Swiss-Prot record:
Annotated coiled-coil segments of the chain: none
Name of the protein described by the UniProt record: AP2-like ethylene-responsive transcription factor BBM2
Keywords, comma-separated and alphabetical: Developmental protein, DNA-binding, Nucleus, Repeat, Transcription, Transcription regulation
Annotated source species: Brassica napus (Rape)
Compartment list: Nucleus
Gene Ontology MF: a single term: DNA-binding transcription factor activity
Record-annotated DNA-binding residue ranges: 210-276, 312-370
Tissue: Mostly expressed in developing seeds.
């Protein structure tokens, strides 16, 4: 049996009751079938009538079988208005189920003909006083429909659930759509549904990574490393603990390595890492001397997730205007940041931070450089914070003695005792002549160094040859002291204030050139000049007077200084006169 067979039983239920309900002849009946209205030509006696009522439901059921498609979804047909409205009866109630299930003719649908529909839109009685709907309008409508729809309905595949909604409103939809447009629209909807791409696997997990502890930010595209610290997890807490941020990275591998290092610090070598444990042997040794928080802070500083102007050193930032480096230390001075100053290089700013960290946090402070670089004892004992120029002076005071200047260990406060002077060995260029000219008119006052005049105020030292057996004179207010070339010692030595220096038979000797720091203010700066003495001096008298002749000082390549470690080779450099 065909599934499209739909009908309503003829029941004489309250036949006489409905006889008195007669529809107005001026009413145009219509049914909304697939968006198109069909009008009753027999009821169109007055074409100017603007009142529209809904056609009875059986007609809509018949046409619904022709307009349904196998691929389309079920539609809810809206039967607007009531089946029959009594205009003159004020006591007429709203539409009832009996109006739709009243007396009618059985409807049977075939592919050849369509049965007649007995009765009009209003059930006026058995003799049908309202007129009948002609088949010409239905055939015209069926002629416009695709044949496939009718065939599909014949096969019984188009039977869908029917939903009738009763609405007391008398207004109808003014937008008229053709059935062809609806069919085309239905196909377009089906095609669009099929054309919609399904979400692929790649679209899921935009912030995930193939590495453990690494996520990719969906906005910036950078990789972030996080670690869940379950050591602070409270009892009864369902979460993993506290999330520790390890920094942002441009490369996924760098973020994965940062997670590995943090995991090794938190959970030891038994934890699971992204890369082999053998690649972190050096880092494992370094992290042993740091706490978890300190090591996490170091990982963050090494990341590329810092804001603009940040430095690789701890506590150092770059000023956005003048470009100089600023140093700050936090959690001091009332749990606030302490400004340490502005520096030309980030290394100097890092040193200032280290000094402040040592001052406030002692030996457990985390510094940018090795703590052995600083005089920790002096920093801790200092009443103030040695930052900037004060730190530089402290650094220079603690700097080891340069190798070119060998300072004697015996320091004497007496001006006549030269044991506290610095004995410097100076090597001069080969072939340079050193001339000492003595003025006959003014004894022991002027000297000439390669034609340059040294005033008597600069150096009051008197030199005399060994043949004259005169001692060199010294002024107690002068820098230079008596230098005697005595015959009691070997010809390869020179006596400086009673101390014999220059053993070994070399070509040149060193004389004290700088005084002690405590007595430096008492002497003129120009007296700190270097003087050389030849191993063998010969006196040559000029015809014009008793002037020492020019002597050539060919200094050897090896020179020793006299001190506790006598015999050690002193470094060489070139000395020039400051005048």
């Amino acid at each position: 049996m065909n599934n499209n067979w739909l009908g309503f039983s003829l029941s004489p239920y309250e036949q006489n009751h409905h006889r008195k309900d007669v529809c107005s002849s001026t009413t145009t009946t219509a049914v909304d079938v697939a968006g198109e209205y069909c009008y009753d030509p027999t009821a169109a006696s007055d074409e100017s009538s603007a009142i529209q009522t809904s056609f009875p439901s059986p007609f809509g059921v018949v046409l619904d079988a022709f307009t349904r498609d196998n691929n389309s979804h079920s539609r809810d047909w809206d039967i607007n208005g009531s089946a029959c409205n009594n205009i003159h009866n004020d006591e007429q109630d709203g539409p009832k189920l009996e109006n739709f299930l009243g007396r009618t003719t059985t409807i049977y649908n075939t592919n050849e003909n369509v049965g007649d529909i007995d009765g009009s839109g209003c059930y006026g009685g058995g003799d049908g006083g309202g007129g009948s709907l002609g088949l010409s309008m239905i055939k015209t409508w069926l002629r416009n429909q695709p044949v496939d729809n009718v065939d599909n309905q014949e096969n019984g595949n188009g039977a869908k659930g029917l939903s009738l909604s009763m609405n007391s409103s008398t207004s109808c939809d003014n937008n008229n759509y053709s059935s062809n447009n609806l069919v085309a629209q239905g196909k377009t909807i089906d095609d669009s549904v099929e054309a919609t791409p399904k979400k692929t696997i790649e679209s899921f997990g935009q912030r995930t990574s193939i590495y453990r502890g690494v996520t990719r930010h969906r906005w910036t595209g950078r990789y972030e490393a996080h670690l869940w610290d379950n050591s602070c997890k409270r009892e009864g807490q369902t979460r993993k603990g506290r999330q520790v941020y390890l920094g942002g990275y441009d490369k996924e591998e760098k973020a994965a390595r940062a997670y590995d290092l943090a995991a090794l610090k938190y959970w030891g070598t038994t934890t699971t890492t992204n890369f082999p444990m053998s690649e972190y042997e050096k880092e494992i040794e370094e992290m042993k001397h740091m706490t978890r928080q300190e090591y996490v802070a170091s990982l963050r500083r090494k990341s590329s997730g810092f804001s603009r102007g940040a430095s690789i050193y701890r506590g150092v930032t770059r000023h956005h205007q003048h470009g100089r480096w600023q140093a700050r230390i936090g959690r001091v001075a009332g749990n606030k940041d302490l400004y340490l100053g502005t520096f030309g290089t980030q290394e100097e700013a890092a040193e200032a931070y280290d000094i402040a960290a040592i001052k406030f946090r002692g030996l457990t402070a985390v510094t940018n450089f090795d703590m052995n670089r600083y005089n920790v004892k002096a920093i801790l004992e200092s009443p103030s914070l040695p930052i900037g120029s004060a730190a530089k002076r402290l650094k220079e005071a603690n700097r080891p003695v340069p190798s070119m200047m060998m300072i004697s260990n015996n320091v004497s406060e007496s001006e006549n005792n030269a044991s506290g002077w610095q004995n410097a060995a100076v090597q001069h260029h080969q072939g340079v002549d050193l001339s000492l000219l003595q003025q006959h008119q003014e004894r022991y006052n002027g000297y000439y160094y390669n034609g340059g005049n040294l005033s008597s105020e600069s150096a009051r030292a008197c030199f005399k040859q060994e043949d004259d057996q005169h001692h060199f004179l010294s002024n107690t207010q002068s820098l230079m002291t008596n230098i005697d070339h005595q015959s009691s010692v070997s010809d390869d030595s020179v006596t400086v204030c009673g101390n014999v220096v220059g053993y070994g038979g070399y070509q040149g000797f060193a004389a004290p050139v700088n005084c002690d720091a405590y007595a430096a203010s008492e002497f003129d700066y120009n007296a700190r000049n270097h003087y050389y003495f030849a191993q063998q001096q010969q006196t040559q008298h000029s015809p014009g007077g008793d002037f020492p002749a020019a002597m050539t000082n060919n200094v050897g390549s090896n020179m020793y200084y006299h001190g506790e470690g006598g015999g050690e080779v002193a470094p060489t450099f070139t000395v020039w006169n400051d005048n």
